[in-house]
Amino acid sequence: MSMVYFNIFMAFTVSFVGLLMYRSHLMSSLLCLEGMMLSLFVMMSMTILNNHFTLASMAPIILLVFAACEAALGLSLLVMVSNTYGTDYVQNLNLLQC
């Protein structure tokens, strides 16, 4: 494994660990998800370019489309929660609490 792939994999791992550790705030969870998507995009693009997979060249663009949709939905949820409750705690999203 080259050093570039290792660094991108470490970026994904750090984002994933950040998602697990800082899951109490919605904004930090969204930032960690975006970091994971960015590292996946770079890893997928580099793999496709290095291995000359011409049939899979659309996959990184499709991943970016899904990441943009995820970001838009996450930010709209963040705005709704912060307007309703005044904070961005994820525990406010639990519908089973009274």
Swiss-Prot record:
It is found in: Mitochondrion inner membrane. Keywords: Electron transport, Membrane, Mitochondrion, Mitochondrion inner membrane, NAD, Respiratory chain, Translocase, Transmembrane, Transmembrane helix, Transport, Ubiquinone. It is an enzyme of class 7 (translocase). One of its GO terms (molecular function) is NADH dehydrogenase (ubiquinone) activity. Its EC number is 7.1.1.2. GO terms for cellular component: mitochondrial inner membrane; respiratory chain complex I. GO terms for biological process: ATP synthesis coupled electron transport. The keyword DNA damage does not apply. It is a multi-pass membrane protein. It comes from the Eukaryota. The chain crosses the membrane at residues 1-21, 29-49, 61-81. It holds the Pfam family Oxidored_q2. It catalyses: a ubiquinone + NADH + 5 H(+)(in) = a ubiquinol + NAD(+) + 4 H(+)(out). Core subunit of respiratory chain NADH dehydrogenase (Complex I) which is composed of 45 different subunits. Belongs to the complex I subunit 4L family. Core subunit of the mitochondrial membrane respiratory chain NADH dehydrogenase (Complex I) which catalyzes electron transfer from NADH through the respiratory chain, using ubiquinone as an electron acceptor. Part of the enzyme membrane arm which is embedded in the lipid bilayer and involved in proton translocation. PANTHER family: NADH-UBIQUINONE OXIDOREDUCTASE CHAIN 4L, NADH-UBIQUINONE OXIDOREDUCTASE SUBUNIT ND4L. This is NADH-ubiquinone oxidoreductase chain 4L. It comes from Arctocephalus townsendi (Guadalupe fur seal). The gene is MT-ND4L.
